[in-house]
Design a protein with these regions (language model features):
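Short, ordered coil/turn segments that flank beta-strands lining enzyme active or ligand-binding pockets
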Residues: 81
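Secretory-pathway extracellular proteins and peptide precursors enriched for disulfide-bonded cysteines
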Residues: 15-16, 133
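Short acidic/polar N-terminal linker immediately downstream of export determinants
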Residues: 2-13, 19-73, 84-104, 119-121, ...
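Extended, compositionally simple hydrophobic/Ser/Thr-rich segments
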Residues: 44-56, 101, 108-239
Length: 239
């Protein structure tokens, strides 16, 4: 009798659990996909969170467009203050769909990505200003070319890939963050890595590297000036 009762419970509970599991993971926004142009300008920094796929390119005029399910696209807020374009949702909802965002602007200074945002930046190779990139959460970004100087701050499980050339690459990496810059020719590199982070850099003249915790800094090149500091299991390794 007890065995039959347990079987009956399993037959009732299992479909219910499967339904709840599916309901938690399905995309709640089944509205039609739209393209929406956004009338914003006067910014040189971009901040974005949530689940956006952001593509940024250099152009002579400002242009911003979002593509995705209508309900989600129409719930995005676009605010400009202190030269920052801040992209967020007005209302928090789990399991948002990925929204594609295209941004064109003449001058680009800083990118802040958080959450599960992915980003691609192109067209700013050789820019005379410092390009600053801040990644947190599980964000990922690719820079196809960068400015004369590039500053980075990578934390969480974020990952930055950079190619091109620059006079100086400097900044901090922590947590499980990753910097992949073997394809970026840098005259000078000044990197501090901590936690379980990893950095891969290419340097020609000057290397300043500090690795703590279980972090690793891998470098290619034979810089004449090297200032290397390690502690707590951190390593700086020539490739």
């Amino acid at each position: 009798m007890k065995s039959k009762l347990n079987q009956l419970k399993s037959r009732v509970l299992l479909p219910s659990l499967l339904f709840l599991l599916f309901a938690c993971h399905k995309n709640p926004d089944n509205s039609p996909v739209i393209e929406k142009e956004i009338n914003v300008n006067g910014f040189n920094k971009v901040y974005a969170g949530e689940r956006f796929n952001v593509t940024i390119t250099k152009g002579t005029v400002f242009y911003v467009k979002a593509t995705g399910p209508a309900n989600s696209v129409n719930d995005i807020t676009w605010s400009v203050a202190n030269n920052i374009l801040d992209i967020q949702y007005a209302h928090h909802e789990n399991n948002r769909p990925v929204i594609d965002i295209v941004i064109t602007l003449p001058l680009f200074v800083q990118l802040n990505l958080s959450g599960a945002v992915t980003g691609t930046v192109s067209g700013f190779q050789g820019a005379s200003n410092v390009l600053r990139t801040v990644l947190s959460g599980a964000s990922k970004c690719i820079f196809n070319g960068t400015g004369v100087n590039m500053q980075i701050d990578i934390s969480g499980a974020s990952e930055l890939n950079v190619n091109g050339s620059t006079e100086s690459l400097y900044g901090n990496i922590s947590g499980a963050g990753k910097l992949n810059a073997f394809d970026l020719a840098s005259t000078e590199v000044d990197i501090s890595a901590s936690g379980g982070s990893e950095a891969r850099v290419r340097v020609t003249d000057r290397l300043f590297a500090e690795a703590t915790g279980g972090s690793r800094i891998y470098y290619k090149g034979t810089p004449a000036v090297k200032n290397i500091q390690t502690s707590g299991g951190g390593q700086v390794i020539q490739q």
